Amino acid sequence: MTAFSLADLDRIVRSRAAASPDQSYTAKLVAAGPAKPAKKLGEEAVEAAIAAVQGDRAGLVSEAADVLYHLLVVLVGSGVALEDVMAELERRTAQGGLAEKASRGRP
């Protein structure tokens, strides 16, 4: 397993988002406003789902990496810290999945 973490990627995305849009694809996405990176996230998520359904392991790995990257870009552009998402995941995993889902009041 690699030592590279989601927190590492988050630091890279945040650093690149602060760069000039002329110098950084990440900065260009963030500068475009929330719709552009959100659209890219959706596209990559669909591609990941298709790869999973098709049993394309290599494709799924690649698309999952794209999903994680674009999710972090959306978070950065929306002013949401990865730590907030991780805290929410930690809160949710403190109880069983079905109990946690029921506590949200959604099916």
Swiss-Prot record:
EC code: 3.6.1.31
Keywords associated with the record: Amino-acid biosynthesis, ATP-binding, Cytoplasm, Histidine biosynthesis, Hydrolase, Nucleotide-binding
Broad EC category: hydrolase
Catalytic activity: 1-(5-phospho-beta-D-ribosyl)-ATP + H2O = 1-(5-phospho-beta-D-ribosyl)-5'-AMP + diphosphate + H(+)
Subcellular location: Cytoplasm
Pathway: Amino-acid biosynthesis; L-histidine biosynthesis; L-histidine from 5-phospho-alpha-D-ribose 1-diphosphate: step 2/9
GO biological process: L-histidine biosynthetic process
Keyword set includes Mitochondrion: no
Tagged with keyword Hydrolase: yes
One Pfam family linked to the record: PRA-PH
Subcellular location, principal: cytoplasm
Gene Ontology molecular function: any one: ATP binding
One GO CC term, this protein: cytoplasm
Gene3D superfamilies attached to this UniProt entry: MazG-like
UniProt record similarity statement: Belongs to the PRA-PH family.
UniProt protein name: Phosphoribosyl-ATP pyrophosphatase
